[in-house]
Amino acid sequence: MTVKVKKGDTVVVIAGKDKGAKGKVIAAYPRQDKVLVEGVNRVKKHTRISTTQRGAKTGGIVTQEAPIHVSNVMVVDSDGKPTRVGYRIDENGQKVRIARSTGKDL
C-alpha cells in the first residue's frame, strides 16, 4: 500500500484512543504502513538507568510517541479539515499532492 502521508504533514487521528487529536508527522515508515505523530499514541518505555561521563543519570521511565497505523490518520488541508490525498500532474510535469475534498494543493 502506498503511504500518502509524508513527514511534516499535519494530520488528525480518526480512530483509536487518541481520536480527534491533531499533530505533525515526525517520521513515516512506509514498509510498515505506520507514521509517528507528535503528541499522539504516547507510551511509557522503561529504559536502563545509566550514568554519563559527567556523572548525570539517564533512563528510568520515559514517555515517548509510538507509531500509529496510517489508516487511522487523515491529512489536514489548509482549511483545517481532514481530507483524503490525491495526485495530479501540473503543467511542468511534476506530480503534485492535492486535497480530494477541495482540489487545492497540499
Curated annotation (Swiss-Prot):
Pfam families: KOW, ribosomal_L24. This is Large ribosomal subunit protein uL24. The lineage of its organism: Bacteria, Bacillati, Actinomycetota, Actinomycetes, Micromonosporales. CDD domains: KOW_RPL26 (cd06089). The keyword Cytoplasm does not apply. Part of the 50S ribosomal subunit. Keywords: Ribonucleoprotein, Ribosomal protein, RNA-binding, rRNA-binding. GO terms for biological process: translation. GO terms for cellular component: ribonucleoprotein complex; ribosome. InterPro entries: KOW, Rib_uL2_dom2, Ribosomal_uL24, Ribosomal_uL24_CS, Ribosomal_uL24_KOW, Translation_prot_SH3-like_sf. Belongs to the universal ribosomal protein uL24 family. The keyword Thylakoid does not apply. NCBIfam families: rplX_bact. Signal peptide: none annotated. One of two assembly initiator proteins, it binds directly to the 5'-end of the 23S rRNA, where it nucleates assembly of the 50S subunit. One of the proteins that surrounds the polypeptide exit tunnel on the outside of the subunit. SMART domains: KOW.
